[in-house]
C-alpha cells in the first residue's frame, strides 16, 4: 500500500502557497480504529485530511492544532488533532450514524454534522492557545475550512477534500488540497486561479485516475509556475499509552479512586482518539492511590 504524504508548493512567484495530500491510509486506519459507518468515515476522513495539511502549516516543533466541528446532526461532533510533523488523529461522537444519501446520491456529510460551529485551536506553547470559532456553512468540511481561512486568518483559500468508499465500506481513495493567495497576489493571478479551480469536479476523481498530490498541484497551478518545495510523510498516530492514562487518572480526586476501589471491580479507560481501552485492576488503583 503506497504511503500517505503531503506536498508543499509555491506558485506565481510566491503569490500562491499550496498543499496537497493523499490520505487513504490515514482514513482507513481511523475507520478500523473506530469502526465507523460510511458517512462517519467520510466526515472524519475529510477533517483528518484537512487537519493534516493545516498541521504542517504550523512552524513550531511542538505546535498542536485541534479542529472541532460541533453541529446538531446525528454524528454528534467531529474532532481532529494534528501536529506540525504530519501526525493526525481524530474521532466522531457517533461512529454508527446512518442517514440517507443526499440529492446527488452521495454520502450526506452535511446532514450528519448539521448546523453549528467550527472551532480551531492552535496551541503554540504560549500562555494562551489561539482559538477561533466560526459558524458552519454547508457542514461538508472543505467549505467550512475555506470560510474559516477567509474570516479568521484573512487568507483567501480554496480547500478541496474527498473520501471515496469501496463497496465493502473500506476506504478506496482519500486526499485533498489547500491553495492560498498571499496578500500581495496580483489580480490576473487571482483570476487565473479562480478559473482553474472552477474546472475541478472532485479530488477523488483525480486520485482515481492515479494522480499524485504533485500531479494535482501541477493540474491546479501548472500554468502559474508551480514549484514543489517539500514532501512530508503523514499518518494516523495516537500518542496515548498506559502511562499517559495513569497520569490522567491521577488528576481525578482521591475520593473517586477510593470509590472505584471499594466497588472491587477493574476499570477500563478508553482513549477517544484511537478507541484503545486501558484496564486498571483494583490492585493498580490501590497503588495509584498510595502513590499520589
Language-model features, listed with the residues they occupy:
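Cys/His-clustered metal-coordination modules, chiefly Zn-binding fingers
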Residues: 198-292
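Interaction interfaces in information-processing and related assembly proteins
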Residues: 1-230
